[in-house]
């Protein structure tokens, strides 16, 4: 019987003929031994236009608008009991174009979120409808080669990178995005913004005894030298604005520095969508690995209108954990978010279908996926969260078999990760359901 490690750091990827294996990691947590992990990836994120849900093949075209289907209730999005009312109110202000009305959404997830698959298309659709208020939160450097935030080119060197899904340290200081970056003098980061309209920025870092400084420049013009020195270890934030916007930021530490990420925004009105994905992540990242007080401080500072919790794929391999531990961990994660932000809207987003091959070579849905979806739906109802059924939105059981047989394929060879086209389909349905929920909210 497989025993689930806390947190689950598991990503299965098969690349047809081209395999790239990352180092095997072994660790112990709470008496459980982490099995060897192979981090492989067989998809390449692309910046291609969105395609409608009904299209199997489509040439590049402008972003489509999801077609709203107003109804009393949705089988895919359960937003009963006013679970999303706070979010809908914020979105309505942005839609009306109220000055400075910025709706912030943070999306915690696993490897597809790491590559900004699904989330990148959700961001594009929402910003097309409600206004573009900027890129949002971006990590300091790439923890994995496939990390990306659409519209941002990120390069860095000299950083010691520690994602929350590794086990070298358990101090819980992972910032908002779940990755810490430490460096001495030799490190640097350059962030190129394809849309130069970003004008409001904020550096997330750690204050600590004997901390060094970070030199910030925008478009080769010096902005500030930010001291990270502090009497005690605590979160630090440095906000700055660039008149007219910036297309390039440079960060250079001097002495010891510990950074988390940077936000890039526009004045609004509009939407900001933070994609906070960790490769191999599970719900235990939020329920155990993030330091509770530190993470609460990060959330309160970011002040999102909606927190999306999107895990389950990596847990699907661990039957015993699903039966005896998963629900408790999910409830704990929700309780942590509620304690930090009592009024925030929370949406639990189910995992996608996940396929596996039978002895005869056929592709079937892993039987643990529907069980996870059922647990998530129940917990969402019990805790006052909204719930989006990604599994059903894709087509339910057998979806990965159909998507793998599609031309072009909508899922990679690992039967886990969607192709960019598959990700766009999910994003289109998700945004359609949110927009329909907003229209229902308006007429209540």
Located regions from the model:
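N-terminal low-complexity, Pro/Thr/Ser-rich intrinsically disordered segments
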Residues: 52-95
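Conserved N-terminal glycine/acidic-rich loop preference
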Residues: 303-316, 324-339, 347-387
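Catalytic His-Asp segment of secreted/periplasmic serine-dependent ester chemistry enzymes
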Residues: 27-28, 291-292, 352-444
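Hydrophobic membrane-insertion alpha-helices, especially the h-region
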Residues: 7-24
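Conserved SGNH/GDSL esterase-like catalytic core that processes O-acyl groups on lipids
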Residues: 104, 113-328, 417
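Juxtamembrane proline-rich low-complexity "stalk" or linker regions positioned immediately after a signal peptide
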Residues: 28-69
């Amino acid at each position: 019987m497989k025993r689930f490690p806390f947190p689950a750091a598991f990503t299965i990827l098969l690349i047809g003929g081209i395999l790239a294996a990352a180092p095997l990691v072994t660790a112990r947590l709470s008496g459980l031994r982490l099995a060897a992990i192979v981090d492989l990836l067989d998809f390449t994120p692309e910046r291609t236009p969105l395609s409608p849900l009904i299209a199997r093949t489509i040439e590049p075209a402008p972003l489509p608008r999801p077609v709203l289907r107003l109804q009393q209730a949705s089988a895919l999005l359960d937003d009963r009991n006013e679970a999303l009312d706070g979010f809908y109110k914020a979105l309505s202000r942005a839609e009306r174009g109220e000055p400075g009305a910025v709706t912030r959404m943070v999306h915690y997830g696993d490897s597809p979120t790491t590559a900004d698959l699904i989330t990148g298309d959700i961001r594009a659709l929402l910003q097309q409808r409600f206004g573009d208020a900027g890129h949002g939160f971006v990590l300091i450097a790439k923890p994995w080669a496939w990390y990306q935030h659409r519209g941002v080119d990120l390069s860095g060197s000299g950083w010691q990178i520690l994602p929350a899904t590794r086990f070298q340290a358990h101090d819980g200081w992972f910032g908002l995005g779940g990755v810490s970056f430490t460096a001495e003098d030799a490190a640097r980061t350059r962030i190129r913004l394809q849309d130069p309209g970003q004008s409001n920025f904020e550096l997330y870092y750690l204050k600590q005894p004997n901390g060094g400084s970070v030199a910030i420049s925008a478009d080769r013009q010096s902005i500030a030298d930010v001291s990270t020195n502090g009497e005690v270890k605590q979160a630090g934030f440095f906000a700055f604005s660039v008149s007219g916007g910036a297309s390039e930021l440079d960060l250079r530490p001097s002495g010891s520095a510990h950074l988390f990420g940077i936000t890039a925004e526009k004045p609004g009105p509009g939407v900001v969508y933070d994609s906070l994905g960790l490769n191999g992540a599970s719900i235990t990242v939020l329920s155990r690995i993030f330091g509770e007080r530190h993470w609460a401080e990060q959330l309160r500072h970011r002040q999102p209108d909606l927190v999306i919790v999107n895990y389950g794929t990596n847990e699907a391999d661990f039957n015993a954990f699903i039966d005896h531990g998963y629900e408790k961990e999910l409830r704990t994660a929700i309780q942590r978010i509620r304690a930090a932000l009592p009024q925030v809207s929370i949406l639990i987003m189910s995992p996608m279908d996940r396929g596996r091959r039978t002895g005869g070579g056929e592709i079937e849905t892993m039987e643990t996926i529907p069980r996870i979806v059922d647990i998530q739906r129940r917990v969402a109802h019990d805790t006052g969260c909204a719930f989006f059924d990604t599994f059903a939105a894709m087509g339910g059981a057998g979806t990965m078999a159909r998507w793998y047989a599609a031309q072009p394929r909508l899922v990679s060879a690992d039967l886990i990760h969607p192709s960019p086209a598959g990700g766009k389909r999910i994003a289109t349905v998700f945004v359609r359901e949110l927009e329909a929920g907003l229209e229902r909210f308006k007429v209540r």
